[in-house]
Amino acid sequence: EDDFIKSINAKVAYTDYRHSELEVGIVGTTFDNESLEARVELLHQDFWNWRGGLSVHYKKSDFTAVGAEAFTPPSETNSIALAWIEERHFGDVLLQLGARIERTEINADKVRLPEIELVSNEHDHEEHDYHDDHDHASPATQGMTRNFNVSHVFNPTSLSAGLVWDFTDGYNLGVSLSHSKRAPSASELLSFGPHIGTGFYEVGALFALHDDHGETPHFGLTDEAVVMETSNNIDLSLRKFKGDFGFIFNAFYNEIDDYYYEQATGLSADAGHDHSGHDHGDHEEESFTLPVFAFSAQDVTLHGFEAQVAWQVTEEFAWRVQGDIIRARLKSGGELPRTPPARLTSEFNYQGDRISSDLFISYYFEQTHTAAMETSTDGYIMMDANVNYHFNLGQHDLAVYLKAENLTDEYAQVHTSFLKDLTPLAGRSFALGIRGSF
């Protein structure tokens, strides 16, 4: 009992994930991500009324993309982090402290800077044909195809502090402050090619667009240092957690310097050949273009509000309503793309001896705060429901269920999706099944 270490927890996970992106039934690119992750937590005995401990987190990820439309090179990411958390009560006030230091290393071989033809989205190819004959290459295309190795090391750190005040029975107020850094991912740095999953020609932050002095627009290696995201955040909360009626209200404000996101360039690039299967003749292949989006590190602000109210009406019936809204803006002016719209949801639950049921009604507001080259998204209402009948079969618990989604057959687009215009949410659907635990 006098030992300093109270408990040790360890977790190890190995994942070998693979998926393929299809274009009209043809595999365009196969992604393979093999990762090993380990975490060890050491909790100490209480000393001077402090509770907490240390944790060590290690992760290794090997990523490859193979195919005609592989937009990122093979890369290896290694990270190891040491974190510390502590908390202590001072009367009705709980003080929480935390810190984290990390080392992240990104290595990639065969990073490509290919020669591509860029055209303005405001004009067609005939008006702006930047492709010259091979015997008379333009300055913008000379030497554009290059291969090189990349190695970057980042040392992000994080600090946090919070107070929770139980100012009366069943209620508390909370405030938390945090300062954190994040290393960019391999895809945010190294991407260069067509990405079917987003419908963009993606270019990583390691490359910069050059279009000054009357030159033909082209990409080259950036002259700027690769930076980490730096965020400063404040959260305020009010909770009621005792009794049949409760609520949580939370407001937050976050300033992020060098926030990585995909920014529209106003240009398009040749993305390869058409795989639609149309007959273009024996010696003719039709190419297509995609809008070019480049990862950019910009200073942004995010602020918003979240609320949740829950009421246990009777022993069998419960009701919950919650909503959230967020604004995300560039400090230089303008909106961040693909910001979620305001949302309001209501949930009704019934739990009987044998029968349980749920009804979900969600209202997504119209999103009109859009970035350049981004369209607004109409609001919509989604209604889902399910009914379950529970029974026993021997020693096993089983349930027959009927599930219905999008009961009103609403046409709905997800504003946060890169492909919202091509892949709306599914229409009305029903599922009947049985589930159990053995």
For the regions a language model picked out, list residue spans one by one.
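Face-selective signature of the C-terminal outer-membrane beta-barrel domain
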Residues: E1-D166, G174-S178, K240, F245-F252, ...
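Gram-negative outer-membrane beta-barrel transporters
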Residues: F252-I256, Y260, A264-T370, Y389, ...
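Conserved C-terminal beta-signal and adjacent last beta-strands/turns
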Residues: E86, V164, N172-S178, W319-I325, ...
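Residues on the lipid-exposed face of transmembrane beta-strands in outer-membrane beta-barrel proteins
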Residues: E1, A38-H44, L82-R88, A161-W165, ...
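Solvent-exposed loop segments that connect transmembrane elements
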Residues: I106-S151, S191-T222, Q263-A294
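Transmembrane beta-strands of outer-membrane beta-barrel pores
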Residues: Y14-R18, Y58-T64, F90-D92, I101-N107, ...
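Membrane-embedded beta-barrel scaffold of Gram-negative outer-membrane proteins
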Residues: I8-E21, D166, N172-G174, S178, ...
